[in-house]
Each structure stands twice: as structure tokens, then as C-alpha cells.
């Protein structure tokens, strides 16, 4: 399947299919040099898939640390210096092969190298179906996640579904959080549909039918980011579950999607408090338990520490913490939330696990 962005200009294709990786070769000839920045774990399993591409004299492979460990100033400088040592021109391509962190990191390299070179995303995880589309790239700071970055569109997104076959279950769980988030944004019917399809751990682990939901997720994100590329309005909705989730992820060092799922439950609690919504918190907690999400760490949440991370969230303004909240399905808002409400919601979340 081929999707296409519909911006007024500078559009790019998104290939979502088995065997999509073959499309890379059609781009290589266009560039003076190409650098494949590949996640160390992906390289272990799939190095042979890039043998043909690496046979080109102008194509280089750079193995980078897996996951968030790569999104540091140190790794950024080391990688940039290596690429610059090849006397690159602006007609250079950075090709990101890996999960969301790899795409974030490689995209920031592409955005800043010579003030911008070509960038191709080759996502290899379910999680990256979200991050590879929309043009957000960046690295982390000691103050929080993704605080240093840019909006930078790729030249193409090449999503070969073959990569998903070797994902460990932890990564399936992490990626599913973003797929589920897109369903929540699409409303009650879409949420019920995905919950009925992926109703337990066994079905989720099989990935049966995941292709369809990944494609739906990409289409959902495309509709939003094309309407609001620079996150001035509706694009903020894509941060559902992320205000609290990022804080939990950064402090407790758990996978991104696991933390986002905790953040989704948390925002339901906040919405119930602020709007007298009637979200069934037990339903969502039980659903996550059925899927196999490890939630024991919720009892160890320390609000004061997490709140300091929430204060650094990119959605905030001078008035304080802003959260994306589902008031009712189909009625999503970006709302300022006071510290006391946030604290009470954290305390209430913990009561479900005592």
C-alpha cells in the first residue's frame, strides 16, 4: 500500500507493505552519498537485507545504540563527525533503520547536517508507525524527552512489515499503545473494534490483523499532521497519554508505549475529575492486564518527581501543565490542569493497584 502526504508542497510517499524495503534502491542513485543509521539490534537480525544496498560505493552503514540510548548529545556529535569526515554535500541521504528512537535521532542528524540533507525513514517496529510519519525529530536532554529537535519532513517512509516478525513481545506491547491511541482518537466505535480484535495477549502476540490497524493509524496521523504540521492546534491531540506518560517513561525507564498506556489511564481519571466524565477506569485497566502490560510499577509512582518532568512538557505554556483529555469520545480537548488535580489523579490511579 502506498500513501501520500497532501501538503501544499514537499510531499512524500509512505510505503506500507511486505517487501517495501526494495524501494530504497530506487532512491540511492539520486544521492551523492547515503548513510544508513541502523539500530544495533536490527543489524543483528537483518544485516543481510542491506547487502545489495551496501554494495554501492557511496553507501555507508553506521551502527548506533538501540532505543533511547542513542538520543544523546554525545552520540549526536560522534555520528555527525563521522559523517562529516566523508566530505558530504547537501545531496546526501540519512537513512534511519530502526524504531522510533532511531528515526528521531537520524532525522535530527539530517535536519542539522549542512542545515538539512535528505532523510528516509525505514521503521522496523510497530511503535515507529507513529513516529516515522509527521516530521518530528529530536534528541533528549537531562531535563526531559525530545526537548531538542525540529520539524523535518522525510523524503520517503518505507515501512516493510517483514521486520515486525522478529519483535519481542515487550516491543509489541510498546508499539500497540500508539495503535490503540489512534483508535481512541477515532472514537468509541474504533476503540471497541480494536479491543474486540486484540482481546488478549495471545492474539496481540500473534500480530494477526495488525497490518490493517497500522495502516489505519498512519492514515489517522496523516489527517491530523497535514492539517496542523507545527502542532499549533489539533496535532496536540496526538499527545494523548504522553504528558504523564513521558514523565513515567523518563523517570522509571520503562518502554515508551508502556508509559503511554499508563498515561492514557491517567488522563481518563483526570477527565472524570474535571468534566464529570463517566470513563470506566476499571475497564481500561483490566484490558491492559489482559494484554499483558506490566503495571506493578504504578504503586511506586512518586507524584512530586513526576510533576517536575510534567512541567517540562512541550505542550505547556505560562499557565502551566496542559494535557490532552478525552472529555467524551469524539470530544477531545487540550486543557490546563492544576497541580492539585494532577496529584489527586495520581493518588487515585495507585488505589487501583493496592
From Swiss-Prot:
Location(s), subcellular: Cytoplasm
Pathway info: Metabolic intermediate biosynthesis; chorismate biosynthesis; chorismate from D-erythrose 4-phosphate and phosphoenolpyruvate: step 2/7
Gene3D superfamilies reported in the protein's UniProt record: 3.40.50.1970, Dehydroquinate synthase-like - alpha domain
Cross-referenced InterPro entries: Dehydroquinate_synthase (IPR050071), DHQ_synth_AroB (IPR016037), DHQ_synth_fam (IPR030963), DHQS/DOIS_N (IPR030960), DHQS_C (IPR056179)
GO cellular component terms given for this protein: cytoplasm
EC code: 4.2.3.4
Cofactor(s) demanded: Co(2+); Zn(2+); NAD(+)
Gene Ontology annotations of biological process type: amino acid biosynthetic process; aromatic amino acid family biosynthetic process; chorismate biosynthetic process
Cofactor detail note: Binds 1 divalent metal cation per subunit. Can use either Co(2+) or Zn(2+).
Binding-site positions, Zn(2+): 178, 242, 256
Reaction equation(s) it catalyzes: 7-phospho-2-dehydro-3-deoxy-D-arabino-heptonate = 3-dehydroquinate + phosphate
Keyword tags: Amino-acid biosynthesis, Aromatic amino acid biosynthesis, Cobalt, Cytoplasm, Lyase, Metal-binding, NAD, Nucleotide-binding, Zinc
Record family assignment: Belongs to the sugar phosphate cyclases superfamily. Dehydroquinate synthase family.
Function: Catalyzes the conversion of 3-deoxy-D-arabino-heptulosonate 7-phosphate (DAHP) to dehydroquinate (DHQ).
Protein name: 3-dehydroquinate synthase
Gene source species: Staphylococcus aureus (strain NCTC 8325 / PS 47)
Amino acid at each position: 500500500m502506498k500513501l501520500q502526504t497532501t501538503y501544499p508542497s514537499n510531499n512524500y510517499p509512505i510505503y506500507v507493505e511486505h517487501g517495501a524495503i526494495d524501494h530504497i534502491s530506487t532512491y540511492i542513485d539520486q544521492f551523492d552519498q547515503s548513510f544508513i543509521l541502523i539500530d544495533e539490534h536490527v543489524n543483528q537480525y537483518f544485516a543481510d537485507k542491506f547487502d545489495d544496498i551496501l554494495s554501492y560505493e557511496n553507501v555507508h552503514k553506521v551502527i548506533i545504540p538501540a532505543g533511547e540510548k542513542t538520543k544523546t548529545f554525545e552520540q549526536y556529535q560522534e555520528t555527525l563527525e563521522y559523517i562529516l569526515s566523508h566530505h558530504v554535500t547537501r545531496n546526501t541521504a540519512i537513512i534511519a533503520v530502526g524504531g522510533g528512537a532511531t528515526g528521531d535521532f537520524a532525522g535530527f542528524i539530517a535536519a542539522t547536517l549542512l542545515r538539512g540533507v535528505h532523510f528516509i525513514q525505514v521503521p522496523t517496529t510497530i511503535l515507529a508507525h507513529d513516529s516515522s510519519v509527521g516530521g518530528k525529530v529530536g534528541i533528549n536532554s537531562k531535563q526531559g524527552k525530545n526537548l531538542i529537535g525540529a520539524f523535518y519532513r522525510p523524503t520517503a517512509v518505507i515501512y516493510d512489515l517483514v521486520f515486525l516478525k522478529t519483535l519481542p513481545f515487550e516491543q509489541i506491547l510498546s508499539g500497540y499503545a500508539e495503535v490503540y491511541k489512534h483508535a481512541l482518537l477515532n472514537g468509541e466505535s474504533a476503540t471497541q473494534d480494536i479491543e474486540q480484535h486484540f482481546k488478549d495477549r495471545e492474539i496481540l502476540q500473534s500480530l494477526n490483523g495488525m497490518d490493517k490497524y497500522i495502516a489505519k493509524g498512519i492514515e489517522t496521523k496523516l489527517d491530523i499532521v497535514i492539517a496542523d504540521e507545527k502542532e499549533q492546534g489539533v496535532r496536540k491531540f496526538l499527545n494523548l497519554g504522553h504528558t504523564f506518560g513521558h514523565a513515567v517513561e523518563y523517570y522509571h525507564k520503562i518502554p515508551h508505549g508502556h508509559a503511554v498506556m499508563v498515561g492514557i489511564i491517567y488522563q481518563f481519571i483526570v477527565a472524570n475529575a474535571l468534566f464529570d466524565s463517566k470513563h470506566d477506569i476499571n475497564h481500561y485497566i483490566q484490558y491492559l492486564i489482559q494484554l499483558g502490560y506490566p503495571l506493578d510499577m504504578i504503586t511506586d509512582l512518586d507524584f512530586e518527581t513526576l510533576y517536575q518532568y510534567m512541567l517540562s512538557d512541550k505542550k505547556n505554556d505560562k499557565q502551566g501543565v496542559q494535557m490532552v483529555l478525552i472529555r467524551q469520545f469524539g470530544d477531545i480537548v487540550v486543557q490546563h490542569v492544576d497541580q492539585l488535580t494532577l496529584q489527586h489523579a495520581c493518588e487515585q490511579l495507585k488505589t487501583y493497584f493496592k
